[in-house]
Amino acid sequence: MRHLFVIIITLLMLQPIYVKADNSQLYKQLDAAIEKRAHYVEVKEKSLNDIKQGAKYVTSNEDKLKLYEQLANGYKAYEYDSAMTYVKKGLVLAQKSNNILYHKRFQLSQTSLLITRGFYAEAKNIMQKIEPKEEDPLDYQFQYYYTLYGLYNNWSTYC
């Protein structure tokens, strides 16, 4: 029993050495990924441009709303201004076509973008207007509460 205890303590003491070796390997992988940044940007731009090209041939409002949502989501973590542009286009089209669910979804996207920029009070005002109802789809309800969690989590952390 005593030998087992000594072995366990010895292994625990060697653990930081092993972790440090792993970190150097992880740094190498990270450096390699950073070197490929231009390639990743090119792939992302091509993907977004393909969606934009497809949008030229779409005539139904429902399909345009789907494409605007794809573009907004594609730009969300990539380029704030472009994401907000497609969110606003989606809001206008959803309101014009009287599509309540898409209007709420674009407001959620707008709220998420505002949260990333620190506009917590503005995000809260939007969230209060679009609280889900029982008849709303479950994915919308989930997204709403997830966004609300993000709002209050960020607000409490950074303010």
Spans of model-derived segments:
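A "functional boundary" signal
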Residues: 5-6, 16-159
